Amino acid sequence: PAGAAACNIVEASSEKAYVSLQGIGVVMVFNPTTMTKIADIDLNNLKQSDTRVAPAAMIIRDGKLFVGLNQMNAQYMPTRNNIELAMIDVKTDKVEKHIVNTTLGLCFATRPIDPGSIFMDENKDIYINCIGSFGFIPGLNGGIVRIKNGSTDIDPDYYIRLDKTEVVGLTTKYANFLSTIFYADNGKAYAYANSFGLDPDGLKNPYVSLTNIPVVIDLKQKTVAVIKGMEISNPQGIAIGRHKNLIVFGSANKKANGFYTYNPDTKEVVGPVVQVKGNPSFFHSFEK
């Protein structure tokens, strides 16, 4: 539909998938085999009084679709520290719950262009990357929260707030938000942390400034640390993926545009192993 701004797809089966349409507040249900529409799930009644609701990244667990909800004003910004999701039953395609947390001091659940901003670990705990206000509005904060296995509420006792969590090895000490995140295993996630203080023009020209630095996140210990030897990228060249036992980072930095590898076991950084023109914004390996 016009103005839909489709951003994320999750597949329930060969006959049913969901696409979030952030521009019109709808999750569309469709058949991914025949590519025919099944239904629209309208979420606009979940909007706040001063914002519109934009469904973003999604994940399915135990027959329930969890949809990150971005509440945005006319400037595409949140107005309060609410973490919100919609929970939809995959069998009926009905909204069963509007999940809201107002106590953890975070907002903007999931990033629409980053499917990894909502993920599940080996324990089937769901983790959500909250973008906050992209670092533009003090007090509207970014970080990570979770929904534990067996629960449909945001865990009130677990969070990583970036305004309160010092990033080990980061010269500016604190990150504004996690631009993209990739869960590996054993409670370890890899991300690009955005800190506008890394570039003198960070806030003046946020789309091309060098403000994104690779970090490793220990979800169990709730720590964030810079990966030593990695370059600082602009916010467009921030791919993260895995190839065999290596974590692969796309980076558009002062020295090169290309892909770098990080070995979690040896901590070795190599690269660029491949150089590209433009911004290395996506990576996928077909190796098991």
Residue ranges and their predicted role:
Residues V67-N82, Y127-G143, A191-S209:
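Short, conserved, GDST-rich strand-edge loop motifs in beta-rich repeat architectures
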Residues Y174-S251:
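Loop/turn-rich, solvent-exposed surfaces of beta-rich toroidal or solenoidal domains
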